[in-house]
């Protein structure tokens, strides 16, 4: 609420303070803006100045048509034509100034804004990110808000100034040509302004609602595709498609309203025709009774009408000023905010004379987070850590362990009490100096999307290569780094995505080591790793911690038992304090926690430590081969590091996308053939309005030069009626045109999206493993590419039909009136077309390239904000800004090119317009002088053809849209035409009943996108119906792959998977999956209610069945305790629920299906002890209640003790099978593994 109130305040202030947009302009920018404004004003004036010469030519032609051979006639025509040449050259300069100066200053100012904003935000205290702002808001500001400002400065400001110039000079010149006409016409301005403003505002309102509605649809798809295996496993495809279809239906209705609004908005511009009817009538009166000239009446009228239209356009641009003002005010409010704890401020605090020793004291500390003032995090917390001593912090979630780590880094200041280092209150120390002596390794590795070298140098900015290598060796990282393609210069992807978890953690450790810290802070540094990888990493940490003051936060006993002191925290206070042996002797809270953890196999015994320290393992450290295999095989999707794969030249799936004909869309469009026909007829007819209007203008002007007043009146009456008719036709035809094409386009878009999603759900999961088929890419295709297809079929075809009609009719009329003049005008139009095309298309292309170049710097900013705690801890703000500046260099280079092209494009387009006018009028005068045509013919031909060049250029600029549309159609049909091994989900045998026997016979398997890496080798396993089996082995041995094959997420080519002796490939896949259920390590919970999540895949379930499933999953009690019970919203991806709650909901979902085959994949690996026990109890209850075949994957062996059978897998092969007791007693590999995991009752 507070943040919202601030935003509203900022918005209200910004509406009154537009100058805030220009706050970062220096003197160079001011000069550029002044010159750009002069250019824009000059550009706007040029049209009205040209009318001075147009009126003179018209009067010369009109009044001299009975004596065209006079010398004065020829001289006047030549003189006015020459004036047009001069005006064209002048406008070349001012338009270039307009385009170049505003483009250049926008690029300069926005780059300064982005840099200053990012630096200011990174200097804020951590609590600022907790309560005042979200990460997404900052990223939105850096990308979207700054883009709004850039768009305003580069496009909207010059356009606004130009249109205001046209309006003001239009009124001035209109009064100059005929003040009487101007005074009478002023009230009609209202007719030009109000309709467009009202409909335009309503159109914007509908656009926002439409965007919001599709965001909901996109969220449904994004959540479903990001957990595609869960959707397929629970056969929930139909449910997702139904929800998606309902939202798309609402989106379609809004699209139809947009079509109507657009028709009204465009059609209302036809009101200008009615104004011309009035001006023609009143102007004829002035010619007859006030001795006004026809040329000046036309010039006065066109100046007034153009001025009114320009004012309406300028007023619509004001909303961009408002939006940019709000964005700029929002940015400046963050820049101006003074950080309460600024780690970059070297003026505050002092640096002690002696080197830091590392004694840490917490004295009666009380802390409350500003974001949760009602909750006390630490209360009367007291703890002392002597120099070189290691202290472990243990306790339940929320007890304050990580808060202690945060306080020592001075992320927060305590409400009461003191935090001291070497006896000094840390509030009095220079913060940058203090943090330089602290090293941090957390569970979240917090790496950046740059090279390994730069990531390590975040720890010490000026570190030498020797220091970097030394730190990497100390962290056991040097071996795998040197095996990467580019060694230390290897780029590791967004947030280190191209490295495994173990590799990332070791780089984070090296980054801490390179600082040579006096105090080392380890916050859950190994919690997300498997057993053996954890021990190897822990070994590196133990070596690093030696001789340093160390604080360790962990919930695993194996991590903390070697600490000098263990502090047991509860409710923000130290409940117990002492060594491991002392606390075990007391037999209190710590001892109970140890016993609970031993029950679930968290503690590693000393023999495992000995094994890690053995020569064999140390040799593995040096070569890193086995470590890479272990750390990278933590899931089926990461068998080896993608970087390693790249160096091995592994073939990547690449589907060539052939060009697709537009005719492929006909079946999707054909249901709306009536709407298409009405739209095309309306567009064709409306296209004819422009040349008819131009012809009428030419006729009106010639009528002003009629021989008699009666003849003038008769002709003006006819043209006035034509103008009025054109107004009603314009509104009617635009309504029909835009609504019909909107109806066709919206329904086409709805059909394509539904068909694509239905098709995507038939694809095998291997398809989703390829980078170009990641969730974000698929969502982009459904959103952007289908929208492009819709725009192509509806908007672009509508405009194309309208343009072809208008240009064709204009050329025919021109040729019929004066074929010689028409041919000359048509002949020079390619130049005009080329300039307008260059201006529109090239600028658009450069703008897109510039935006693309900005994306790199935005990505750096995004990572910095996402990892703001580690940036703060490392004091790396300047390093981030340095990388950010380097990333902006490419954008700066492209921006410079865009500025020159903007200036050249605008200048040449405007210049050639006036040069062609000069030629047209000169040649028209020549023809009139020769007596081949009349003055009226010149007027009519000129006005009919003068605008066709611009119209053709506008249509020609669609070539890029057509190319995009063709590519989009190809992309869409690439999905729709793609064959899938699972496409016909109703194909295959539906067995009468399923017993649950599973046979995997002689299987050799590799993932489709990694064909050279064998995951399973001659793998065989026979699982009897109704039995339970556990799959055991190190990370990457193939356990989860077996689960995937049983679900038929992948097909095997060598060997086979059988269910009840039937080949799984011959069984109806949808029917089969309805008899299975999967619960994985990461519980998938979707936005929606708890009940919606439980009934996923079985929507027909009754409320009693849902409650029964929840009770069986040990979830009913916590659900009932919530205010809305089963109707409680889970939030996106279940953010409102804890890990244990989400896991129990996932179990309830599985139980509701009454599965014959239950698959459990690392269900409890990421849970704390209490949550693990609750989930284990639920699983035990379910497995005991029904006769089902259960396959369990786990690395905590104690969870498998009660299973019927255990299979030990090594390198993709089953090497031992049997019961737990049998395998433990035979003295094989399982026995050694069991002892290593301390499996004692």
Swiss-Prot record:
GO terms for molecular function: ABC-type transporter activity; ATP binding; ATP hydrolysis activity; ATPase-coupled transmembrane transporter activity. PROSITE patterns: ABC_TM1F, ABC_TRANSPORTER_1, ABC_TRANSPORTER_2. It comes from the Eukaryota. ATP 1 binds at residues 395-402. Glycans are attached at residues 48, 571, 632, 648, 773, 855, 1187. It is a multi-pass membrane protein. PANTHER family: ABC TRANSPORTER DOMAIN-CONTAINING PROTEIN (PTHR45136:SF2). This is Putative ABC transporter B family member 8. It comes from Arabidopsis thaliana (Mouse-ear cress).
């Amino acid at each position: 609420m507070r943040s919202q109130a601030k935003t509203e305040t900022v918005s209200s202030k910004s509406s009154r303070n537009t100058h805030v947009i220009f706050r970062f302009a220096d003197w160079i920018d001011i000069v550029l803006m002044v010159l750009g404004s002069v250019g824009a004003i000059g550009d706007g004036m040029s049209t009205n100045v040209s009318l001075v010469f147009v009126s003179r030519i018209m009067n010369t032609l009109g009044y001299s048509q009975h004596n065209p051979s006079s010398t004065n006639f020829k001289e006047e025509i030549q003189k006015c034509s020459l004036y047009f040449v001069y005006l064209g050259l002048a406008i070349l300069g001012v338009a270039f100034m307009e385009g170049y100066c505003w483009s250049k200053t926008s690029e300069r100012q926005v780059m300064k804004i982005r840099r200053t904003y990012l630096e200011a935000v990174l200097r804020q205290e951590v609590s600022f990110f907790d309560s005042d702002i979200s990460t997404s808001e900052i990223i939105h500001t850096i990308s979207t808000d700054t883009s709004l400002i850039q768009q305003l400065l580069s496009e909207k400001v010059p356009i606004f100034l130009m249109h205001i110039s046209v309006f003001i000079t239009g009124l001035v010149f209109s009064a100059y040509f005929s003040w009487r006409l101007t005074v009478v016409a002023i009230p009609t301005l209202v007719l030009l302004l109000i309709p467009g403003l009202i409909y335009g505002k309503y159109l914007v309102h509908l656009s926002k609602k439409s965007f919001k509605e599709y965001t909901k649809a996109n969220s449904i798809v994004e959540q479903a595709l990001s957990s595609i295996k869960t959707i397929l496993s629970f056969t929930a495809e139909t449910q997702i498609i139904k929800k998606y279809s309902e939202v798309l239906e609402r989106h379609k209705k809004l699209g139809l309203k947009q079509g109507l609004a657009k028709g009204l908005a465009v059609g209302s511009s036809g009101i200008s025709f009615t104004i011309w009817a009035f001006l023609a009538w009143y102007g004829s009166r002035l010619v007859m009774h006030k001795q006004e000239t026809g040329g000046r009446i036309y010039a006065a009228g066109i100046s007034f009408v153009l001025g009114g239209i320009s004012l309406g356009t300028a007023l619509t641009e004001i909303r961009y000023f408002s939006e940019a003002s709000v964005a700029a005010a929002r940015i400046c409010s963050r820049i101006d905010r003074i950080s309460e704890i600024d780690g970059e401020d070297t003026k505050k605090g002092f640096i002690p004379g002696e080197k830091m020793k590392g004694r840490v004291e917490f004295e009666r500390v009380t802390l409350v987070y500003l974001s949760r003032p009602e909750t006390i995090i630490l209360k009367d917390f007291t703890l002392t850590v002597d120099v070189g001593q290691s202290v472990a912090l243990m306790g339940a979630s929320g007890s304050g362990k990580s808060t202690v780590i945060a306080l020592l880094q001075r992320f927060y200041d305590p409400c009461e009490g003191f935090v001291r280092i070497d006896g000094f209150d840390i509030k009095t120390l220079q913060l940058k100096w203090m943090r330089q002596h602290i090293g941090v390794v957390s569970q979240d590795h917090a790496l950046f999307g740059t090279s390994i070298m730069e990531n390590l140098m975040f720890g010490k900015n000026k570190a030498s290569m020797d220091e970097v290598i030394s730190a990497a060796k100390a962290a056991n990282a040097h071996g795998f780094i040197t095996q990467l393609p580019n060694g230390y210069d290897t780029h590791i992807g967004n947030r280190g995505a191209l490295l495994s978890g173990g590799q990332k953690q070791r780089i984070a450790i090296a980054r801490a080591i390179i600082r040579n810290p006096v105090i080392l802070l380890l916050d859950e540094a190994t919690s997300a790793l498997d057993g053996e990888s954890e021990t190897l990493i822990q070994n590196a940490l133990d070596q690093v911690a030696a001789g340093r003051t160390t604080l360790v936060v962990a919930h695993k006993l194996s991590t903390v038992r070697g600490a000098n002191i263990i502090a047991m925290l509860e409710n923000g206070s130290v409940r117990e304090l002492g060594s491991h042996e002392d606390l075990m002797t007391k037999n209190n809270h710590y001892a109970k926690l140890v016993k609970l953890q031993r029950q679930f196999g968290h503690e590693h015994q000393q023999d495992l430590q000995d094994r890690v320290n053995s020569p064999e393992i140390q040799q593995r450290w040096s070569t890193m081969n086995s470590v890479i295999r272990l750390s990278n095989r933590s899931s089926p999707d990461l068998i080896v590091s993608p970087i390693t794969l790249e160096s091995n030249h592994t073939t990547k799936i690449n589907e060539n996308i052939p060009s697709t004909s537009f005719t492929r869309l006909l079946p999707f469009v054909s249901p709306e053939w009536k709407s298409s026909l009405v739209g095309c007829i309306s567009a064709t007819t409306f296209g004819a309005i422009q040349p008819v209007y131009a012809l009428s203008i030419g006729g009106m002007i010639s009528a002003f030069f009629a021989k008699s007043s009666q003849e003038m009146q008769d002709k003006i009456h006819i043209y006035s009626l034509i103008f009025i008719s054109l107004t009603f036709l314009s509104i009617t035809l635009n309504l029909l045109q835009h609504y019909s094409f909107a109806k066709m386009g919206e329904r086409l878009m709805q059909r394509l999206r539904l068909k694509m999603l239905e098709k995507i759900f038939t694809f095998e999961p291997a398809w989703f493993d390829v980078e170009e088929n990641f969730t974000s890419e698929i969502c982009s295709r459904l959103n952007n590419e289908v929208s492009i297809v819709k725009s192509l079929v509806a908007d672009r075809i509508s405009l194309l039909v309208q343009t072809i009609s208008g240009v064709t009719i204009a050329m025919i009329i021109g040729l019929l009136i004066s074929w010689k003049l028409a041919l000359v005008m048509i002949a020079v139009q390619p130049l005009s077309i080329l300039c307008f095309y260059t201006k529109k298309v090239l600028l658009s292309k450069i703008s897109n390239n510039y935006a693309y170049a900005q994306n790199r710097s935005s990505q750096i900013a995004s990572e910095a904000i996402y990892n703001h705690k580690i940036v703060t801890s490392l004091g790396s703000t300047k390093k981030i800004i340095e990388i950010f500046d380097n990333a902006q260099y490419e954008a700066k280079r492209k921006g410079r090119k865009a500025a020159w092209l903007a200036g050249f494009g605008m200048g040449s387009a405007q210049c050639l317009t006036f040069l062609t006018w000069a030629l047209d009028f000169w040649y028209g005068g020549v023809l009139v002088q020769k007596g081949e045509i009349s003055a009226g013919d010149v007027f009519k031909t000129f006005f009919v053809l003068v605008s066709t060049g611009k119209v053709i250029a506008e249509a020609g600029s669609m070539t890029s849209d057509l190319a995009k549309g063709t590519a989009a159609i190809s992309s869409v049909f690439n999905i729709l035409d793609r064959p899938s091994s699972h496409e016909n989900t109703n194909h295959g045998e539906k067995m009468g009943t399923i017993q649950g026997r599973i046979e995997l016979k002689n299987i050799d398997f590799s993932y489709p996108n990694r064909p050279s890496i064998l995951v399973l080798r001659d793998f065989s396993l026979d699982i009897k119906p109704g039995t339970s089996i556990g799959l055991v082995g190190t990370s990457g041995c193939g356990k989860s792959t077996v689960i995937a094959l049983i679900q038929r997420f992948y097909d095997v080519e060598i060997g086979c998977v059988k269910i009840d002796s039937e080949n799984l490939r011959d069984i109806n896949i949808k029917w089969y999956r309805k008899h299975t259920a999967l619960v994985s390590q990461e519980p998938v919970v979707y936005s929606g209610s708890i009940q919606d999540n439980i009934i996923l895949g079985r929507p027909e379930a009754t409320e009693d069945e849902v409650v029964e499933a929840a009770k069986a999953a040990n979830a009913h009690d916590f659900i009932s305790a919530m205010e809305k019970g089963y109707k409680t919203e889970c939030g996106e991806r279940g953010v409102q629920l804890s890990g244990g709650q989400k896991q129990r909901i996932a179990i309830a979902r599985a139980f509701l299906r009454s599965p014959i085959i239950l698959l459990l994949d690392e269900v409890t690996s990421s849970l704390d002890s209490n949550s693990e026990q609750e989930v284990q109890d639920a699983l035990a209850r379910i497995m005991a209640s029904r006769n089902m075949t259960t396959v369990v994957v786990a690395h905590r062996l104690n969870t498998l003790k009660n299973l019927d059978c255990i299979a030990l897998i090594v390198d993709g092969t089953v090497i031992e099978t049997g019961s737990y007791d049998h395998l433990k007693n035979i003295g094989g590999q399982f026995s050694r593994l069991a002892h290593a995991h301390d499996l004692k009752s």
